[in-house]
């Protein structure tokens, strides 16, 4: 029996409709916390995909990317599904290394900010990490907010504090020696330690728990020149460029210890700084924080 070309076309269609999907993928990128990983989907005979990255996150994109926010061992699964609903699943194990720098995530109702804690200020870094690991900050408020200046939090008295209560005097019962580092300045997003005034604290020791994040305002070359003359130090070219580009609060330099910097989530900082406040600069809505160590 002679088979026509049409026969082979029909046969190919039948065979392809019976073919089961094949699930397969590779991944590209550095396997480290906060480094994006791109997945190369090499599946066959599939029209839909279900990814599970092993950390509670999923995707239905054909070729997704994913960023892990905690180190550890994870199992990634990909389900490839054809148009008839038949499916195949493949899994691969991945080990995510911790970040090369000290990072914390500050969560709020307006989003999250990722903050680097500097190795150059070891006492402040160690103390902040200790408090974070103890859960000290969880549920505390950003109790003082001044747009174009800063947002301040970390007072233990702010937890469940009723509206109208004066805040800002609480702490863990100790202070920390100042750690002024010439290279660390109050550009937008800088995290620094709050403290009591010079009259009662001439050594400029830092609060054991209260901190602020600089929102700042625009800074001009004239502003920096005046501060250099008043305070008797010189900004580096890089510091001047950072202030001119991002703004900040340079008048606080060398008076308050800068020990970190926001590296992600500036739009969240802007939202927090813009909330309505009462005459004491306390936000009218409670801005609760939850801080965790990225490791």
Language-model segments: what does each one mean?
Residues 1-26:
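Bacterial Sec-dependent N-terminal signal peptides
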Residues 7-10, 42-43, 54-59, 84, ...:
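Intrinsic disorder/low-complexity detector
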Residues 8-10, 47, 216:
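A ubiquitous, low-specificity "background" feature that marks scattered single residues
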Residues 18-20, 32-38, 44, 65, ...:
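Cyclophilin-like peptidyl-prolyl cis-trans isomerases
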Residues 24-28, 53-54:
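Surface-exposed, proline-enriched loop/turn segments that connect beta strands in immunoglobulin-like
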Residues 48-66:
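Surface-exposed, flexible coil segments in extracellular/virion-facing regions
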């Amino acid at each position: 029996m002679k088979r026509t070309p049409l026969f082979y076309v029909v046969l190919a269609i039948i065979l392809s409709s019976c073919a089961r999907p094949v699930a397969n993928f590779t991944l590209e990128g550095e396997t480290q916390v906060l480094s994006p990983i791109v997945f190369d989907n090499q599946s066959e005979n599939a029209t839909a995909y279900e990814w599970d990255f092993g950390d509670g996150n999923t995707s239905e994109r054909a070729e997704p990317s994913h960023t892990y926010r905690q180190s550890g061992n994870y199992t990634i699964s990909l389900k490839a599904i054809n148009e008839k609903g038949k499916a195949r699943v493949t899994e691969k194990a991945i080990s995510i290394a911790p970040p090369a720098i000290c990072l914390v995530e500050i969560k709020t109702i307006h989003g999250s900010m990722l903050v680097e804690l500097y190795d150059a200020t070891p006492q402040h870094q160690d103390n902040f990490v200790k408090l974070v690991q103890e859960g000290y900050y969880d549920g505390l408020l950003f109790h003082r907010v001044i747009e174009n200046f800063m947002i301040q939090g970390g007072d233990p008295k702010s937890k469940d504090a009723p509206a109208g209560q004066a805040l800002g005097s609480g702490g863990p019962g100790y202070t920390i020696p100042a750690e002024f580092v010439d290279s660390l300045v109050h550009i937008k997003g800088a995290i620094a330690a709050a403290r009591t005034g010079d009259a009662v604290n001439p050594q400029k020791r830092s609060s054991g728990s209260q901190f602020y994040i600089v929102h700042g305002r625009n800074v001009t070359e004239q502003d920096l020149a005046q501060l250099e003359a008043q305070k008797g130090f010189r900004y580096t070219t890089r510091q001047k460029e950072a202030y001119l580009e991002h703004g900040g609060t340079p008048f606080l330099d060398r008076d308050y210890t800068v020990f970190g910097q926001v590296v992600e989530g500036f739009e969240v900082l802007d939202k927090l700084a813009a909330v309505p406040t009462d005459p004491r600069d306390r936000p009218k809505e409670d801005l609760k924080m939850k801080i965790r160590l990225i490791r």
